[in-house]
């Protein structure tokens, strides 16, 4: 069976991470909907701001990961750190009137860039 990944090291492989607020107690369907919206928006944003990462991510299996945070403050701290290191991100809001931030999508970016951002978070 052929390997879909090239010979890049794990550290340099790319992924997209979905940081999901656990305090909102969203249903599985709501989480899927929010993550799908975020994936498309992060993809579109990546075409402009990080096209090389996007091309590599598409070529190497489009790895995705979901993690959870306890609250919005924790999610926004991660967003600030992503901004500081230059990682693409997109924040999903469930209702434009209420502007409730539900999911932070980060990437695509190399694994090593996530070490300081999401390593300590639990998978969803």
Curated annotation (Swiss-Prot):
Presence of the UniProt keyword Cell membrane in the record: no
Enzyme class: hydrolase
NCBIfam families named in the record: arch_pth2
Pfam families per UniProt: PTH2 (PF01981)
Highest taxon of the lineage: Viruses
Record InterPro entries: Pep_tRNA_hydro_II_dom_sf, PTH2
UniProt family annotation: Belongs to the PTH2 family.
GO molecular function: peptidyl-tRNA hydrolase activity
Name of the protein this chain belongs to: Putative peptidyl-tRNA hydrolase
Keywords recorded for this protein, A-Z: Hydrolase
Reaction catalysis annotation: an N-acyl-L-alpha-aminoacyl-tRNA + H2O = an N-acyl-L-amino acid + a tRNA + H(+)
EC number per UniProt: 3.1.1.29
Transmembrane segments: none
PANTHER family: PEPTIDYL-TRNA HYDROLASE 2, PEPTIDYL-TRNA HYDROLASE 2, MITOCHONDRIAL
């Amino acid at each position: 069976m052929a390997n879909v990944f090239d010979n890049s090291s794990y550290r340099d492989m790319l992924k997209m991470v979905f940081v999901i607020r656990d305090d909102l107690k969203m249903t599985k369907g709501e989480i899927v909907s929010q993550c799908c919206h975020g994936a498309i928006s992060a993809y579109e944003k990546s075409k402009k701001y990080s096209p090389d990462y996007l091309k590599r991510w598409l070529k190497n299996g489009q790895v995705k990961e979901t993690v959870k945070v306890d609250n919005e403050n924790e999610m926004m701290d991660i967003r600030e750190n992503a901004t500081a290191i230059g990682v693409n991100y997109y924040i999903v809001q469930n209702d434009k009137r209420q502007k409730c931030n539900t999911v932070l999508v980060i990437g695509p970016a190399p694994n090593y860039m996530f070490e300081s951002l999401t390593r300590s978070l639990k998978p969803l």
